[in-house]
Amino acid sequence: MKNLISFFDRSKGKWISQRTTYELSNKNMSSVQSQMTMKIGNSLSGSIILASLNWGDIYRQVAHYAKNHSRSEYDNKFNLQFGNQLNNHKLLTLCIVTDPSLISFKTRYGSTTIDETYWFATNNLRLSTSIVKRFNTCVAVSFCSEIKV
């Protein structure tokens, strides 16, 4: 848990993001530049709000429900819950963090799986990759670089 909190603590602040996404089925490529603000939240009703992320109109909150977490011999895997303002769905995500500079998320929603990996290249440069699979077939990949401002 210490590495997870440390990763989000390093992520606090305002970031400029450049993301390139490739849709494999129709060979489309899109590139988007955006701004994001990340804040660390407070503890609420048995949960710890690890981060609140803002990308313009999109808001995503990352919470860790400590009472539902059974400690295993590996202290680097957590189940996190993502909430957003776009709909009322709560997505359960497996989070794997092995050091304060690298974090991986695995989210399943129906037949879709999203694997995301984020890491710090330097203190103000964070990189990420995302792989979207539907029925275990890769349908999209994404590469992102974020600079802290």
Curated annotation (Swiss-Prot):
What keyword terms does UniProt attach to this protein? Answer: Chloroplast, Lyase, Plastid
| InterPro entries in alphabetical order | Calycin, CpcS/CpeS
Enzyme type, top EC level: lyase
What GO MF annotations does this protein's record show?
lyase activity
Kindly indicate whether the keyword Calcium belongs to this entry: no
Describe the task this protein carries out: Might function to covalently attach a chromophore to Cys residue(s) of phycobiliproteins.
**What is the protein's given name?**
Chromophore lyase CpcS/CpeS homolog
Q: Which gene encodes it?
A: cpcS
